A protein has these predicted regions:
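Active-site core of bacterial EAL-family cyclic-dinucleotide phosphodiesterase domains
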Residues: 1-9, 46, 163
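Residues at alpha-helix caps and immediate loop-helix transition turns in enzyme cores, especially N-
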Residues: 2, 56-58, 87-91, 116, ...
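Structural preference for long, well-ordered alpha-helical segments in enzyme cores
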Residues: 5, 9-10, 23-31, 61, ...
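Short, contiguous acidic/charged loop-to-helix segments that flank catalytic cores in large enzymes
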Residues: 10-14, 18, 52, 135-141
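Short glycine/proline-enriched coil/turn segments at helix->beta-strand junctions
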Residues: 11-12, 37-40, 101-103, 124
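Catalytic core of bacterial c-di-GMP phosphodiesterases, primarily the EAL and HD-GYP domains
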Residues: 15-90, 165
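Conserved acetyl-CoA-binding loop-helix of GNAT-fold acetyltransferases
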Residues: 19-22, 143-149
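The catalytic core of metal-dependent phosphodiesterases that act on cyclic dinucleotides
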Residues: 64-138, 149-178
């Protein structure tokens, strides 16, 4: 089941913390197996804004992570650009608690290239995922960074660009330029 399919039902029903908990548990299993194999690979684990705000789920989640900081080198928590941009005091405090434990973040579902890379880095974001379509369209407005310059901007700020949703062979060739 793809996230877009279950999220339409889970979000209005207030079930996203439960869904995130299940996904987190599975991600931790994968990370533990990678660690046994001495792999340096990372696993991206999506967390919804609903979970960051959940007064029952999130404190327990942070407490678990406090006891499992060894996961920080392999587990990257991922948030949509909408969640990052819409983060209020509670969400920011939640992210700060995880960052203080050494966990890194990724911003995905990026549709607007107008963001402050330095601010993202300061909040422990180390990855930004942009779709191939967004990169190849190269859409920008006056004064904003062009998609072709995004990789260098992010690199200067200690953030790695990941181009995702590459679905056609021609796109592979085109995105290699980034």
């Amino acid at each position: 089941i793809m996230p877009r399919d279950y999220m339409r039902v889970a979000e209005p029903a207030g079930m996203m913390p439960t869904v995130d908990n299940i996904l987190l548990f599975r991600c931790i299993q994968v990370v533990r197996k990678l660690a046994q194999r001495k792999s340096k690979a990372g696993v991206f684990c999506n967390i919804s804004a609903f979970s960051l705000l959940d007064e029952e789920f999130f404190p327990q989640f942070v407490e678990y992570m406090q006891h499992n900081t060894d996961l920080a080198q392999h587990l990257i928590f991922e948030f949509s650009q909408a969640t990052v941009n819409g983060a209020g005091h509670v969400e920011r405090a939640s992210l700060e608690a995880l960052a203080a434990l050494g966990f890194r973040f990724s911003m995905d579902q990026v549709t607007d290239l107008r963001f402050d890379a330095g601010s993202l880095h300061d909040r422990n974001f180390r990855f930004v995922k942009v779709s191939a379509a967004t990169m190849l369209e190269g859409t920008h407005t006056a004064g904003d960074i062009h998609a072709a310059d995004l990789k260098e901007l992010l690199k200067r700020n200690g953030i790695q660009l990941i181009v995702d949703k590459v679905e056609h062979e021609r796109e592979v060739v085109d995105v290699l330029d980034y």
